[in-house]
Amino acid sequence: MTDKPTLMVFSAHTADFISRCGGTIAKYSRAGSTVFVVCLSYGERGESPRLWRERAGITVDEVKRVRQEEMARAAHVLGAEVTCLDCGDNPLVVGKDDILKMMSLLYQYRPQIVLTHWTQEPMNPDHATAADVALRTVSHAALVDMEGEPLAWPQVYLFEPSVPETEETHFRPDTYIDITDVFETKMEALRQLDTQPYLAEFYQRYGEYRAWQARDLTGRKDIKYAEAFARYSPWTGSQFPL
């Protein structure tokens, strides 16, 4: 038994958990936490145009295999376990059986912290779908467990929508995680995504931007890279969180 919190991440596509919260995953994993990532799809359509362009005649199953390998390598770099429910993407359609699988994983791991997408994203509706399904699944799991105790409500945080669409999605972060000490780990994980080679440079710049905000809010000059989240779960405790 460990006193370290368990994290579960619900990600619409292969790259989302790495680009949006890869630093936070690495930070918790390095500190001894179990981190389990549930990808709802491989992003075989919406995230893989390069494969479709460069490999004439490639099949959907072959694209999925490439993305699965990239996903597994990246998760290994971050120190996370990962599975994919293979719901398909663009559009992402999550069925009842998939939700039951997600509930089963929540019962198995009983995370204290859950990370998923921001709830509004008109330019990438798969992300909003993933957020809706993840939040409903947590609610279902907190109501009943046919095999034991209902899930204790975890602390839920919503990560970045697609950059640079934050203004259009009304995302307003209230939580910043300093990932300076694990930023190179995040970059190495992003570099495993040969299908999306531009992401590492892109999220380096955005990590710097969020760090600038975090420095301005805290006065801490040592924050060079950060990830931003919006709290979904109300805080309940004997004292204010610090």
Predicted features along the sequence, with ranges:
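Metal-dependent de-N-acetylase/amidase catalytic core
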Residues: 1-10, 81, 88-242
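Active-site rim/loop-helix segments in enzyme catalytic domains that contact anionic ligands
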Residues: 1-109, 238-239
